[in-house]
Each structure stands twice: as C-alpha cells, then as structure tokens.
C-alpha cells in the first residue's frame, strides 16, 4: 500500500520508481508475472532474454527461473508517473567463469556457497 500511494504522488521530487529484486517469478507469463505486470510495471524487452540463474537454460532463458527483475511504470493508463529516465540497455552478469575458474563443484553445490542468481543491471542516460 505504501509503495502504491508513494508512486501516485507525482508532485514529489523522487518520482522515478524502479522495482528491483527477487520476485520469485518462475517464468514469464506465470501468475506472479501477471500479478506484477498488471500493476503497470514493465520489464524492458532486452532483459526478458537474460538468463537469471546458473540453472537457466542459456538457449531459452525467458522460459524459466525468471526470478529477478528490474521494472518500472511505463504506461500512462495506470495513473502512475512514468519513468522520466531514458533507458539505454540492460543485461546480466555471468560470474561463474570469474569466481569458479578451476573447480569440479556441481551447480547445486555452488548454489549453497554463493547466490545462484546472476546480477542484473540497467543503464540510463544522464539527464
């Protein structure tokens, strides 16, 4: 409730609202995805094809394990202020080749030592 009320205050100085984090969305278009996007939040198209975890299928990253998101309000039909920042691009970071260089650990074993989620990033233009 608080976030919804805050997002509707378009006269506030901080009206750019980005939703970031682990939403536990199993795959695009599942019920949690629909609940998230039905609020007016949208994820940029180029982030929809980024693998989210070490368990994602690299050839079909948008089909499952769609847990982490970077989203914002982009529609004027919701009555919420649109993001005033210009989105440039986004992606993910596969840390596996840098953290686990010479190891025989399984992906399951790695997930207990470090997060199995790849960090997402978004780049915006300077005003």
Spans of features found by a protein language model:
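Metal-dependent phosphoester-hydrolase catalytic domains
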Residues: 4-18, 24-127
């Amino acid at each position: 409730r608080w976030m919804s009320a805050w997002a509707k205050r378009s006269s506030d100085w901080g009206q750019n609202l980005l939703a970031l984090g682990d939403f536990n969305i199993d795959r695009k278009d599942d019920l949690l995805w629909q609940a998230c996007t039905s609020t007016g939040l949208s994820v940029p198209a180029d982030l929809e094809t980024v693998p989210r975890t070490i368990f994602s299928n690299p050839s079909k990253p948008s089909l499952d394990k769609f847990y982490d998101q970077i989203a914002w309000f982009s529609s004027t039909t919701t009555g919420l202020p649109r993001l005033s920042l210009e989105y440039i691009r986004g992606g993910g970071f596969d840390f596996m080749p840098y953290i686990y260089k010479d190891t025989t650990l399984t992906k399951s074993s790695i997930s207990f030592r470090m997060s199995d989620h790849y960090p997402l990033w978004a780049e915006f233009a300077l005003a």
